[in-house]
């Protein structure tokens, strides 16, 4: 099958949903083209620092063609579309168009689907009340009028809309008036193939030895973009309180320039504590090595793909729900301890870490539960079939 994906940002060194879709579509024999903007740096992307001088280019990643286009308009970094893709769609001749979020190039996709009845189109959706529509103007105008205008025209031609979390479906239903019947949650999966390969090769054991951790040390993984919303300072304080346990905390990730002060705050909190290590921003394979080494993952707040990656690596999770980021749909095997907003505190984190790390039987059961959840809900070998099923023709029945 020929698949064209539209996304605003693509960087081959990361493990975002787009990267994993590329990997697993190609693995299963599909031909993939990704259309994205000319953004290169994830930090520039999240701080809206777009350099319009960067030229368009085409290259290949994991067997997929990546086409990076300039924006033809970019209004306050909120409404932007890259140069028209009518001709590109005709050249690529996709069987499936996969749109990531409400892209303002949707009109070209709609026109293509209208002209090519065999082509299907699906869209995933990453926004919810926790990360979007934080002001009345944004909620009522940006989402409720402008983006809704584009989505309303696309909906008759979308085989399915895939919110990545249940809260996204609520947001679409309440703000965009999308019926629940048009949606189904498609979780952000993880690279289960890579996680299994790391385990098979013993990468975690090797890294554990390289970092000088003892066999009976309990290694805690945390990380992501180092920002105040992550509340990493609470975890550092909790680990400091649990000196009676043999804990080692590994912090993966980096801060943007705007949040360098927060990183400095974390470094000051960890100063003199040899059991707290900052290892910086890592590529995806190195992230999975760290996960394979760890015994437990703790994320005080602000959900990221690392949560799914940790489950894929078979780790018990302790995490905080700051609101509209309920992860209970991935807690089918009691593999996650979820702290509600009013309990995201140093003392509660310390209490739950001790309750899990201090009970080997419970930690083992949570690990086994995480492995089952990963196989059932986070394996892209299975998840991609949910996006492709609309192209499978119904069986024909011969009356004779």
Where are these regions (language model features)?
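N-terminal subdomain of nucleotide-sugar transferases
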Residues: 1-53, 60-62, 240, 381, ...
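Acidic donor-binding loop of glycosyltransferase active sites
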Residues: 292-302, 315-316
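Membrane-proximal helix-turn-helix segments that form the acceptor-binding/catalytic region
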Residues: 107, 129, 141-161, 175
